[in-house]
């Protein structure tokens, strides 16, 4: 599970806003957070002074006759990660957390975020800002109704509110005599001015054919075929998510951190292809790739990114029907299309199609995971040698694993910010160390590594938790129950077209048996050199049904607040299951190839079926990764792999431990203190 944002996938709100929702932030000490109750207020050095920027913003609000202005923390494409160019909320507030909304009135300013970021907000915001510890539109609107007068106008950038978010604000304000006002010129941008980072300008390039599952022409033809088969026969499909355009044309760039995308829209009609982007970024080779020997309906017209609203409005004047996926379309696009000309589904045909990988895409993703396993194994071997020296901290460790991945063939950087967490930090949501704030790795503590890579042939995401010393009995039990959950879901056979939410509980059952649980989702889709969190695959209530060819992560966990955290994450391919009797059934094929920590496994808790599965998995790891290690003369890592994939044998529970439990339980029943 990568560090999550509101953007790339709406499921992340469920996966992560609830994840560890009751864990306590790191206690940074009273002098590390602001204290606005003193005179003068105490402000740590991490605070940003926002007085001048707020004054300038309010002047802009006056020119628009606004009583309030909403500043979301997203961009125009609901990206999971956003570029510096789009970090408006962070710039105006000083708060850089990946989730949260700011609202400014003529007299007050406030930020709403969830428990993951409360301490961070108190460290970064000055006393111009109130911190509200709720999320969603309802608490924001409740606050607005008390702060702005009747007749007040609430402004927003329509390209920063999704259709659903706009509808929730609009509904909440109905009957209040306050008006929601769409303003296409972003007011924060006007204040930011020349200090605002520029839009990235690196080349947009075509993937080599070896790394694509289909040509872009085949993909376009497939989408047009779906248009013709749709009940409402749309004349066009509008693509707003950056991953959609990148996938459709097999194009990549580096506009977004950790994601190989470029700012773009696509309007694919039954007779034309219009790609909205910065044309100057297309080399002659890329332009030729798009239009070499093309005929009318298969020629790509590149139009300026800024013209998308005007172009869609002009197209909408005709006898047309525009098909959109509402989950990724912003209100700024939606408001330009007459409602009678809209064809809406939750997800666009591109989002649905790319969720199911063809045989070539499957092979590419599997190959990337073999090389990724080499990088992770190299790191684990390096840790075993260096942690006892006391020279490794969370941040330097993250740098090393990123370095090892960068040395792998076809590497294009990490797929998210590495989560490198030791001891109690592993129990914190989205903990990522910094050079200034980190914890030393110790042989006496558990260590959680959640990391992934972008490769030309695939995107990876894997989590392993290890302990180099003597773990407690409870740590071993918790780890083993998490492992059992991973195995139970990975080996499950279920009917085709079953939704992920129907089987998700199998990953929790072993934890539930002991009264344990985890607060986050159990998995997410993953792309081919695209998003590390690829919607709409996964185990949430609003994910689509599982189908052969989908890839998903499987990642149960357990988090002991203030002590340790455990997560075991693998990526798995949905495949046909072999059953005794004929039928349409599916199961998972795990494609992550790094062994689990034997030091943390209590074999006595494993059933014969669990052991059989685990030993088969270890044999697969040997077969897939072993030859690659040998080919590259990584002999120390090969020996490590052999040791850590030795077959596990069944073992009876520790009778002494059970006797101790029995004695303690008996004394407790008798009412004696122990």
From Swiss-Prot:
It catalyses: Release of any N-terminal amino acid, including proline, that is linked to proline, even from a dipeptide or tripeptide. Zn(2+) 2 binds at residues 461, 524, 555, 569. It is found in: Cell membrane. Pfam families: Creatinase_N (PF01321), Creatinase_N_2 (PF16189), Peptidase_M24 (PF00557), Peptidase_M24_C (PF16188). It is an enzyme of class 3 (hydrolase). GO terms for biological process: proteolysis. GO terms for cellular component: extracellular exosome; extracellular region; membrane; plasma membrane; side of membrane. Optimum pH is 7.4. Glycans are attached at residues 35, 49, 65, 278, 291. Its main location: membrane. Substrate binds at residues 116, 430, 524, 533, 555. Residues 1-21 form the signal peptide. It is a lipid-anchor; GPI-anchor. Inhibited by apstatin and the chelating agent 1,10-phenanthroline. Also inhibited by high concentrations of Zn(2+). Not significantly inhibited by bestatin or phosphoramidon. Its EC number is 3.4.11.9. Residues 650-674 form a propeptide. Zn(2+) 1 binds at residues 450, 461, 569. Keywords: Aminopeptidase, Cell membrane, Glycoprotein, GPI-anchor, Hydrolase, Lipoprotein, Membrane, Metal-binding, Metalloprotease, Protease, Signal, Zinc. A lipid is attached at residue 649 (GPI-anchor amidated alanine). GO terms for molecular function: aminopeptidase activity; metal ion binding; metalloaminopeptidase activity. It is linked to Angioedema induced by ACE inhibitors: A potentially life-threatening side effect of ACE inhibitors that appears in a subset of patients taking these drugs for hypertension and cardiovascular disease treatment. AEACEI is characterized by swelling of the face, lips, tongue, and airway that can lead to suffocation and death if severe. This is Xaa-Pro aminopeptidase 2. The gene is XPNPEP2.
């Amino acid at each position: 599970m990568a560090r999550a944002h509101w953007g790339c996938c709406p499921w992340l709100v469920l996966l992560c806003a609830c994840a560890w929702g009751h864990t306590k932030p790191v206690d940074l000490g009273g002098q590390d957070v602001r204290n606005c109750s003193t005179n003068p207020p105490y402000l740590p050095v991490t605070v940003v002074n926002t007085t001048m920027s707020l004054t300038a913003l309010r002047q802009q609000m006056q020119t628009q006759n606004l009583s309030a202005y909403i500043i979301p923390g997203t961009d125009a494409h609901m990206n999971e990660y956003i570029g510096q160019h789009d970090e408006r909320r962070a710039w105006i507030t000083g708060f850089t957390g990946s989730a949260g909304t700011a609202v400014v009135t003529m007299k007050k300013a406030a930020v709403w975020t969830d428990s993951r970021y409360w301490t961070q907000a108190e460290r970064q915001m000055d006393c111009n800002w109130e911190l509200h510890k709720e999320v969603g539109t309802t608490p924001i609107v409740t606050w607005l109704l008390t702060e702005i007068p009747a007749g007040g106008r609430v402004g927003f950038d329509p390209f920063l509110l999704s259709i659903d978010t706009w509808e929730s604000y609009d509904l909440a304000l109905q009957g209040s005599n306050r008006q929601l006002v769409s303003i296409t010129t972003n007011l924060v941008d006007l204040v930011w001015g020349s200090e605002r980072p520029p839009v990235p300008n690196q080349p947009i390039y075509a993937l080599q054919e070896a790394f694509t599952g289909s040509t872009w022409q085949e993909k376009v033809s497939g989408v047009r075929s779906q248009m013709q088969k749709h009940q409402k026969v749309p004349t066009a499909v509008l693509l707003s998510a950056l991953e959609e355009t990148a996938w459709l044309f097999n194009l990549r760039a580096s506009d977004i951190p950790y994601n190989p995308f470029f700012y773009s829209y696509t309007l694919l009609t039954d007779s034309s292809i219009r790609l909205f982007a910065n044309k100057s970024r297309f080399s002659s080779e890329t332009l030729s790739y798009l239009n070499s020997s093309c005929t009318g309906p298969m020629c790509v017209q590149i139009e300026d990114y800024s013209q998308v609203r005007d172009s869609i409005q002009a197209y909408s004047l005709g006898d047309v029907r525009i098909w959109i996926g509402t989950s990724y379309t912003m209100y700024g696009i939606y408001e330009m299309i007459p409602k009678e000309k809209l064809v809406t589904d939750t997800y666009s045909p591109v989002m649905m199609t790319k969720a199911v990988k063809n045989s070539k895409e499957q092979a590419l993703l599997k190959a990337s995971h073999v090389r990724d396993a080499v990088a992770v194994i190299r790191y684990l071997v390096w840790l075993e040698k260096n942690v006892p020296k006391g020279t490794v901290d969370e941040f330097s460790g993250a740098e090393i694993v990123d370095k090892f991945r960068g040395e792998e063939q076809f590497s294009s950087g990490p797929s998210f910010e590495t989560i490198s967490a030791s001891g109690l930090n592993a129990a914190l949501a989205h903990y990522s160390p910094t050079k200034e704030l980190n914890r030393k790795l110790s042989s006496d503590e558990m260590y959680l590594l959640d990391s992934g890579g972008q490769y030309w042939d695939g995107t990876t995401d894997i989590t392993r938790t290890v302990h180099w010393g003597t773990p407690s009995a409870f740590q071993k039990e918790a780890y083993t129950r998490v492992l059992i959950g991973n195995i139970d879901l990975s080996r499950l056979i279920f009917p085709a077209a079953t939704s992920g939410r129907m089987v998700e509980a199998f990953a929790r059952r072993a934890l539930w048996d002991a009264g344990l649980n985890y607060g986050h989702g159990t998995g997410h889709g993953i792309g081919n050199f695209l998003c590390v969190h690829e919607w709409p695959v996964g185990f949430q209530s609003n994910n689509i049904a599982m189908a052969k060819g989908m890839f998903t992560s499987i990642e149960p966990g357990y988090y002991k607040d203030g002590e340790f955290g455990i997560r075991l994450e693998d990526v798995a391919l949905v495949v046909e299951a072999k059953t005794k009797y004929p039928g349409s059934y599916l199961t998972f094929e795990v494609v992550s190839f790094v062994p689990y920590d034997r030091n943390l496994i209590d074999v006595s808790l494993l059933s014969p079926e669990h052991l059989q599965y685990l030993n088969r998995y270890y044999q697969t790891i040997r077969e897939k990764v072993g030859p690659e290690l040998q080919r590259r003369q990584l002999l120390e890592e090969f020996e490590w792999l052999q040791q850590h994939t030795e077959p596990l044998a069944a073992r009876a529970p520790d009778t002494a431990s059970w006797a101790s439990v029995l004695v303690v339980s008996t004394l407790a029943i008798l009412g004696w203190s122990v």
